[in-house]
């Protein structure tokens, strides 16, 4: 079991998150022939908005982040990153469930894009996201606030061991 916390992200977190992103996205970007060591980092630096971003911490250490950015017709789920050694342990699902409470309360759509072939797509589908469109690199998904199948969450944070697409950030 791992204890996790969400906290407001800050500019001081940026470079650590940039490095997490480079590790997390490398395999998918290489598979798509799009990995560039500088670009994978710079795209996050250019798009980072700490006011919409939560840092994910386990045992006081920064292990990822997620952003929920309001737009004209929906929220955009962006920059959902979790260090590889903690993936598949329920933390991502619990964090996503917590984050989606806001659009659910507000009756708002949530949109995201994920790289084609990414294992993360299954996580999003389990939380009610469905295909909206796709291109050669990205899959665009949308979630109606009533379509969510809730992930089991403990009362503590304990979990088992406008329609214009958001700017791409590979």
Predicted regions and their residues:
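A short beta-loop-alpha structural element at the N-terminal edge
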Residues: 4-19
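Conserved GNAT-fold acetyl-CoA-binding loop/helix
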Residues: 22-43
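Conserved active-site tyrosine of GNAT-family acetyltransferases
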Residues: 44, 124, 129
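A short helix-loop-beta-strand connector motif used in the catalytic cores of GNAT acetyltransferases and
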Residues: 45-55, 64
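Conserved beta-strand in the GNAT
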Residues: 61-69, 76-81
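Conserved GNAT acetyl-CoA-binding A-motif
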Residues: 74, 103-115
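Conserved acetyl-CoA-binding loop-helix of GNAT-fold acetyltransferases
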Residues: 82, 88-101, 121-126
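Conserved beta-strand-loop-alpha-helix junction that forms the acyl-donor binding cleft
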Residues: 87, 111-121, 137-144
